[in-house]
């Protein structure tokens, strides 16, 4: 499921597949004072609803949680109302992992680079590795060296410029996971935050 945390200023969505954690926070404007709430929503239903609303209108949507109005969001329901339609979904009665404990509050190294160049390089070097094998990124001296492979199939290597702060570091990623993350960033550059090569990195 997708965890939705709501207060009177922001809505935060969090989801995980046990290997990756995605978090998105955006502002909203409630009609009335809103007490802090956290619910778990079926991910497939919420994703389908978002796609349907986005395809039919660009107008803002309304959220309704709890209360007695079954049409908008009765007890145990989340209501979503758009310009031309409305829908409700039943909430899940389950616990979501305490995801904020997985997000480091500080970093020992930070790297910023061009998204298009990085994505293209990852796609090229990963051709030399087996499906699901990792791509290694070595950061140092204003550049990052991407490598993959190294067995009988050969090895691929590419170098890209990077704005890097921290000690030299090599970290390995599943290329598909990185490409998925890069594909949803609405910018031309991406910043990675590291604590050391082993714990998860933040994009």
Regions found by a protein language model. Name each.
Residues 101-104:
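Basic, Lys/Arg-rich DNA-contacting stretches centered on the C-terminal catalytic core
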Residues 1-25, 31-92, 106-203:
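DNA polymerase processivity clamps
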């Amino acid at each position: 499921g997708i965890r939705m945390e709501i207060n009177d200023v922001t809505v935060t969505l969090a989801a995980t597949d046990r290997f990756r954690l995605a978090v998105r926070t955006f502002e909203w404007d409630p009609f009335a004072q809103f007490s802090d709430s956290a619910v778990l929503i079926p991910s497939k239903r919420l994703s389908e609803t978002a796609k349907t609303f986005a395809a039919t209108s660009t107008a803002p949507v309304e959220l309704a949680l709890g209360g007695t109005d079954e049409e908008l969001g009765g007890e145990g329901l989340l209501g979503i109302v758009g310009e031309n339609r409305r829908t409700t979904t039943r909430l899940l009665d389950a616990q979501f992992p305490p995801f904020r404990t997985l997000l480091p509050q500080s970093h020992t190294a930070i790297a910023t680079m061009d998204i298009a160049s990085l994505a293209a390089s990852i796609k090229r070097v990963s051709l030399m590795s087996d499906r699901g094998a990792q791509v290694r990124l070595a950061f140092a001296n204003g550049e990052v060296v991407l490598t993959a492979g190294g067995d009988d199939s050969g090895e691929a290597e590419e170098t890209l410029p990077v704005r890097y702060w921290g000690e030299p570091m090599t970290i390995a990623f599943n290329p598909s996971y990185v490409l998925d993350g890069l594909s949803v960033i609405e910018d031309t550059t991406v910043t990675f935050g590291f604590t050391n090569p082993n714990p998860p990195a933040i994009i």
